[in-house]
Amino acid sequence: MRIRCSIGTAKVLGLNKIRVDALPTTAYLMVGERCRYNCAFCAQARESGARADLLSRVSWPEFQGESFLRGLAHPGAQAVLQRICFQVVQDKVALEDTLEWVKAVKGKTNLPICVSAGPRTLEEVKELLELGVEHVSIALDAATPEIYAQNKDGSWTERFKLLSESAEKFPGHMATHLIVGLGESEEDMVRCLQTMYDKGITVALFAFTPIKGTRLEGVKQPIMSHYRRIQVAHDVIRTGLARADCFQFRDGQLTDFGISVDELQERRGGEPFLTSGCTGCNRPYYNETPGEELYNYPKALTTEEVEEAWANVRAARDKREGV
C-alpha cells in the first residue's frame, strides 16, 4: 500500500530533505484521492481542477507504506511528533483503507491518533474508536446550514446530528473543523463555536484559503482583523473565560468579548493565535505561505507577533477585502 504524507511530515520522517521554518508536531497523512463530494473550496473535490497532491496549500507526496512506517518508527521522528492525523478523502474505499492504516501505525508507535473522515453512522465512529483512535473528526466546515449549502454537498443538519450524537455517546472523542471566511458573520461563527464546546466537541479553526482549480479560487481570504477576533472568541469559549451569550455584536460583527481586550491580552498572550484543534496539532503553513503574516501560528509567538495580533483584534469595524 502507498500513502500520502504532508511535505513537512515527510521531512520529519526522513523521506525528504527540504528546509522548513517550522516542523509539524503531528504526522499528517492522507488516504484516498478525488473525493465523491464536491466542496467548493477543496482541492480534492469531485470536480476540482487542482493538483491531485494538494490539500489546502500543502502538497502531499506519495510514499511506499514500508518507507513511511520505517520513518515513523525512527527515534528522530518520535522525538518531534506528538500525534498522528489521518485526513480521509471520501472515495469509495478510503475509510476501509484507513482502518488498515490505523492498525499498521499502532504496531509502530504509541502516539495518539485522530481520524478526520466522513463516517456515516455511529457504528462507523465506534469502529474507529475501538481500534484505538483517540479523536474522530466530522468536519462541518461551515458555521450555518445556509453557508454549508452554498459550498458543500449533503446536509449540514444531518452531519451536525451525527456529530452531536457521537459526542454524546463517545464523550471527549469527537472533533470538527470550521472554516472562517466562507461568507458567515462573526456572530454566526461564534455561536457555532459555543454550540460545539457545549457538546464537548473539539474545534480546529481554519482560515478559508483559495486554491487554484477550485470553485472558490477567486475568493479572497478573510482579512486578518476578522480572523483574529474569531480566534480570541474561540479561546475565550474553550477556556471557559466567558460564554458567547456575554459577547456583544453589531450587524453581525463581534464588538465585545465580555472581558476587556487589555485583560485578555495580559492573561492569554499569544495562546489564542496558535493553531487550534487536537493537542499537538500545529499544521504549519496550511493556510499561508512562508513570509506572510500567519493566520495560525505553529509555534510560540514572538513579543512583536503578539502585539501585532492583538492590534488586529482591536481594529475598528472592517469589511472583507474586495466586498
Language model features by range: what are they?
Residues 11-16, 29-36, 40-149, 155-169, ...:
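Conserved Radical SAM active-site core
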Residues 56, 86-89, 177-180, 218-221:
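Conserved short-loop catalytic and cofactor-binding motifs
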Residues 60-63, 151-158, 184, 188, ...:
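Alpha-helix N-cap and loop-to-helix initiation/capping positions
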Residues 64, 97, 101, 124, ...:
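General structural feature for long, well-ordered alpha-helical segments within catalytic domains
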Residues 121-131, 180-198:
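Catalytic cores of alpha/beta
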Residues 163-187, 206-213, 219:
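Conserved strand-turn element in the central/C-terminal portion of the radical SAM core barrel
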